[in-house]
């Protein structure tokens, strides 16, 4: 069984976390108590301090912006202060590739693996397990996180090096604007 943490249980994070809860115990954190209560009722283990999420081997993030991801991961009171070596931080936020690479480079100095894995397909696709997941990281890291990503969706692929997932997602969003 995997030691999993999940931060960000909003409109997208909740159904993604629910998929992981089908086969795992998941430690959960969110600033919104209502979001925590919903996931706790589905089996999530509530952590009231961000630092308590650091005990996990795989930490998923699904947050509103890259700036929030940056603050939570490498900020003054961020995860970086408590993460173990060889942990995997998997960012499912619709983020900015430049910020992603910055976070990844800083975490790499602490021997922490960062994967950008944004999703496309909305909350319904997430709940049904068919959402597209575009992972940006080294191939060897992708192979280690792929079993967990496959628990979320059957539609998972490696987009390329760090930042590629977020770049592909941005391109996807841009193309949808013109439809």
List PLM regions with ranges.
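NAD(P)+-binding Rossmann beta1-loop-alpha1 motif at the extreme N-terminus of oxidoreductases
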Residues: 1-61, 93, 123
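Rossmann-fold dinucleotide-binding core
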Residues: 4, 9, 94-174
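Short amphipathic alpha-helical segments
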Residues: 17-19, 40, 71-74, 101-105, ...
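Structured helix-beta-strand junction loops
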Residues: 23, 42, 55-56, 86, ...
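Rossmann-fold NAD(P) dinucleotide-binding segment
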Residues: 50-61, 66-112
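Conserved small/polar residues in nucleotide/adenosyl-binding loops
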Residues: 177-179
